[in-house]
Amino acid sequence: MDILKKSLFLVLFLGLVSLSICEEEKRENEDEEKQEDDEQSEMKRALWKTMLKKLGTVALHAGKAALGAAADTISQGAQ
């Protein structure tokens, strides 16, 4: 009976150690995935910022061109 108890305790101990190692690896994998997600979101944010900046520049030039065309039309109508 004593040998059976020792064997059972050994099996339980090894199982707990194995479970602990698996949990640690799982935690590390989750941390790596979170870090990758953070990096991707930063890249997306930078891309959107660049796109919006360029779009704003294009809109500004288009607005200036439209105002210039309107001013030309008004000045031609006044002549």
Curated annotation (Swiss-Prot):
Top-level taxon of the source organism: Eukaryota
- Does this entry carry the keyword Coiled coil? yes
Is Coiled coil there in the keyword field? yes
Q: Name one GO cellular component term.
A: extracellular region
User: Which terms are listed as keywords in the entry?
Assistant: Amidation, Amphibian defense peptide, Antibiotic, Antimicrobial, Cleavage on pair of basic residues, Coiled coil, Immunity, Innate immunity, Secreted, Signal
Query: In the record, which positions carry Glutamine amide?
Result: Q76
Checking InterPro entries in the record gives:
Dermaseptin_dom, Frog_antimicrobial_propeptide, FSAP
Q: What is its main location?
A: secreted
Q: Which residues form the propeptide?
A: 23-45, 78-79
Give the signal peptide range. 1-22
- Could you say which tissues express the protein in this record? Expressed by the skin glands.
Q: Write out the annotated subcellular location.
A: Secreted
The portions of this protein that span the membrane are: none
GO BP terms: defense response to bacterium; innate immune response
Q: Which family does it belong to?
A: Belongs to the frog skin active peptide (FSAP) family. Dermaseptin subfamily.
Per the entry, what this protein does is:
Potent antimicrobial peptide with activity against bacteria, fungi and protozoa. Probably acts by disturbing membrane functions with its amphipathic structure.
**What's the name of the protein?**
Dermaseptin-S8
Source organism:
Phyllomedusa sauvagei (Sauvage's leaf frog)
* Lineage of the organism: Eukaryota, Metazoa, Chordata, Craniata, Vertebrata
